[in-house]
Design a protein with these regions (language model features):
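Phosphate/nucleotide-binding beta-alpha loop and adjacent structural elements of enzyme active sites
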Residues: 1-304
Length: 304
């Protein structure tokens, strides 16, 4: 793109966004006010209770319970040995990059715990959808490792993919107690193999196949799945938790792709209210399962 036009395009995008925000609450209420979906009705009721909120809400779920996750309740300490800041989670130390301030650690942990609340649209597992004892699990976009930590005791092996070098030292420190059961992989997962990037099909060609894959890569989820076609097609037993809120049409696209491969499809509870274009409400996490017992708690969106 010509450098001369880039600032003009950015200004035009900001103007367009501001214009689209006008009347957004009204359009949402018109679009969803009579929905039979209980999750949608809860969002509309929340908006009716909170006329003071500016829309869209971004990554904060439109739910009253989010107020329970105040950053200041998080206690942050510094390890005398490695000098890293950490928090205690279920008696385990979770370490953070050296550049983080105590306030940044508090905010990161508060958001991470809020996201994995069983009521959250960002919850990766719950209500009958979870890993099994002895599973091989993959965490793509591992970040602080909080989610992996919640499952690690049940896993035979965990592979944490995180290309951001800021996280490599703290991840190694956090998971040191589990030795070689946890592997920190300093690569991005992609649709093609390249320097600093790898396909899942390539990575697992000579390794035990995964039983669980979690994907949260800021909109690159399509590329991750494209590079895992062999795993997805051939898996006997596999569960996936895939973020679908980064791109507004990812949920129906992934539902069609994985449903066509024989996976049962469901989703996390609730919605995010992120964008100013239809659909205004986005499901947070798509759950996909093949070769596993069907949870009696859900009516799966199945292509069976």
């Amino acid at each position: 793109m010509n450098k001369l036009f880039r600032p003009l395009i950015q200004v035009a995008q900001k103007v367009w966004f501001r214009q689209r925000r006008k009347g957004l609450r009204r359009r949402i209420q018109q679009q969803y006010g009579n929905s039979p979906d209980a999750d949608i009705r809860e969002v509309v009721a929340f908006l009716n209770r909170h006329a003071e909120l500016e829309l869209p809400m971004g990554m904060i779920p439109p739910c009253d319970w989010t107020r329970d996750y105040a950053p200041e309740r998080i206690s942050v300490e510094r390890d005398a040995g490695n000098g890293l800041l950490y928090v205690k989670v279920k008696e385990h130390q979770v370490f953070f990059p050296r550049r983080f301030s105590p306030a940044e650690v508090q905010r990161a942990v508060s958001i991470g715990q809020m996201e994995q609340d069983e009521r959250s649209p960002h919850c990766y597992v719950g209500n009958g959808f979870n890993v099994d004892e002895g599973d091989v699990a993959v965490f793509i976009g591992a970040s602080d490792g909080l989610f992996c930590l919640s499952l690690v005791e049940r896993l035979a092996k965990a592979h944490l993919f995180e290309p951001n070098s800021d996280w490599h030292e703290p991840l190694h420190a956090t998971f040191a107690p589990w030795g070689n059961r946890v592997e920190v992989v300093p690569l991005a997962v992609d649709s093609q193999d390249a320097e600093g990037r790898v396909k899942l099909d390539t990575f697992f060609k000579e390794r035990p196949q995964p039983n669980y894959i979690q994907v949260d890569v800021d909109g690159g989820e399509r590329d991750v799945l494209a590079g895992a076609h062999g795993i997805l097609q051939d898996a006997g037993k596999l569960r996936l938790s895939i973020c679908t809120y980064h791109q507004r049409l990812d949920f129906p696209k992934f539902e069609g792709l994985l449903g066509g491969l024989g996976y049962r499809i469901h989703h996390s509870p609730g919605f995010f209210l992120i964008g100013v274009r239809m659909p205004y409400l986005r499901r947070g996490i798509l759950y996909a399962s093949r070769g596993t017992p069907q949870s009696p708690a859900w009516t799966w969106r199945a292509n069976e």
